[in-house]
Amino acid sequence: MRPSKKLLIAIISIFLISSVPVSAHADSTTIQQNKDTLSQIVVFPTGNYDKNEANAMVNRLANIDGKYLNALKQNNLKIKLLSGKLTDEKEYAYLKGVVPKGWEGTGKTWDDVPGLGGSTVALRIGFSNKGKGHDAINLELHETAHAIDHIVLNDISKSAQFKQIFAKEGRSLGNVNYLGVYPEEFFAESFAYYYLNQDTNSKLKSACPQTYSFLQNLAK
């Protein structure tokens, strides 16, 4: 028996919804809940700063699955938005003149890096996009992914399962001398692709199907 046109549309709709991250079709209530959680995590700078860009960063962070954001909150992690250099902050002053891992030979030091993530997250406002002192698809999602990897998922990027995936797909997102060398960087960048928007999500699914499935299963 041939299915009706309405049934076909319904089946196709279900398939499309199931193939994208939760954030891509989250309702306004879910997004607002994520923003409420972020209001307890994100620390804005004092003084003058680009409030529109800072709010845009928060909006992009709100795409992340709420269970990760809640876990960060429960672990008392703060995402600090900065109006100036990372190393101008007292807590990161010790990084002045230090060359970051993977940046050897670039002539760059932490003074030039717009963000960091792990046990803490710090992000320069206005440096979200690729080419703004970094090669990540999105600064805030990439660095927050490091914190989720380390704090929430117990360094899952170092797990045998992920390393097997990394061995097959770690060079598939470009920047092979960085993403293709460090599993934790490939995890963070893949996470950013997964949650940034529908276009980047689709690119990840096409280029790195095993990584995509890995992230999809983690979010369940």
UniProtKB/Swiss-Prot annotation:
| Localization per Swiss-Prot or TrEMBL | Secreted
User: Would you name any one GO CC term?
Assistant: extracellular region
Single GO MF descriptor: metallopeptidase activity
Q: Could you say which residues form the signal peptide?
A: 1-26
Q: What is its main location?
A: secreted
Q: What happens when the gene is disrupted?
A: Cells lacking this gene retain CD630_28310 on the cell surface, show higher affinity for collagen type I with attenuated virulence in a hamster model of infection.
EC number annotated for this UniProt entry: 3.4.24.89
- Residues annotated as binding Zn(2+) are 142, 146, 178, 185
Could you tell me the Gene Ontology terms of the biological process aspect for this record?
A: proteolysis
Specify whether Zinc is a keyword of the entry. yes
Which cofactors does this gene product need?
Answer: Zn(2+)
Specify the ATLF-like domain's residue ranges. Answer: 35-220
Keyword terms, alphabetized = Hydrolase, Metal-binding, Metalloprotease, Protease, Secreted, Signal, Virulence, Zinc
Q: Would you identify the family this protein belongs to, as annotated? A: Belongs to the peptidase M34 family. Pro-Pro endopeptidase subfamily.
Subunit and partners: Monomer.
Job of this protein? Zinc-dependent endoprotease with a unique preference for proline residues surrounding the scissile bond. Exhibits a high preference for an asparagine at the P2 position and hydrophobic residues (Val, Ile, Leu) at the P3 position. Efficiently cleaves the LPXTG cell surface proteins CD630_28310 and CD630_32460 at multiple cleavage sites in vivo. Has a role in the regulation of C.difficile adhesion versus motility by cleaving surface adhesion proteins such as the collagen binding protein CD630_28310, and is important for efficient infection.
Protein name in UniProt: Pro-Pro endopeptidase
